[in-house]
Amino acid sequence: MAVQKKSIIVIAIISTLAISIAVLASRMRPRSVTKDTQASSAKSEIVNDSKKDQPDHNTRKDSQTNNNQVSQVNSPKEEVEKLYGIPIGKRNKLNVTTQIQQRWNFCAPATVSMMLASRGKIVDQFTLAREMGTYEPFGTHNRDAIRILNKHMFGYEFPQTNQAGYRIETVREINSASIELFKQRIIKNTQDGYPMYYTFNPGKIYPGIANAEHNVAGAGYIATPDNKDVALVYYVDPYYKFQDPIYGGLKVVTPEELLNAMVGVSEPDYAW
């Protein structure tokens, strides 16, 4: 029994010495190893975080094997802006401020007043109505509206061939030639800073509205994506029922729709 006790004591002493040596060795390990490990871990987290903000292009299998293909996939595609489903380009809008027509049959005086105001010429609707000969139950004939428009805009009622001034175009039919001419005149007037004068049937423009005859002020256009053609036409409507809480009387319509709405009224005209 004494021998066994001595053996147990020796083994215990040896175990204690081994544990002490192991503890001492761990305390003497270089701290730079720990620092390097921490630095490596931080760098990986930064890389991973940066990847979170990038679009995931790994759904394409070939992007993992071809660097050129990856760059092509990562390149953002230029998206064409659309308005009411129609691709558009630059907005070319004239500064035509909405006026509400002050009588039910004052759409022409209100339209002309807006057109004049856009050029810094202030003439009230009642003065214009009197000069135009606006009457009930019809309203204003376009020839008189444009005559008075020219008077206040340019100083004469009937411009000569070589003089600046508004001319009336009567829309008899719609075809590629008449549409192209209409669009070119819109572009030219807008570039020169002059609104246009449109007469149309609001029943063809506004859903649920009865057929009638109405005048509005053309206020420029929105170009096609290549900025070479007319995609949509701006106009400002003076009738109180056709006002938007945000945009007022400002509307857009395609040139084809606008011309189509002119056909069929008693005076299917626009002035440019």
Segments from the language model and where they lie:
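Conserved active-site-adjacent core of cysteine acyl-enzyme catalytic domains
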Residues: M28-R31, P76-E81, I86-G89, T127-W272
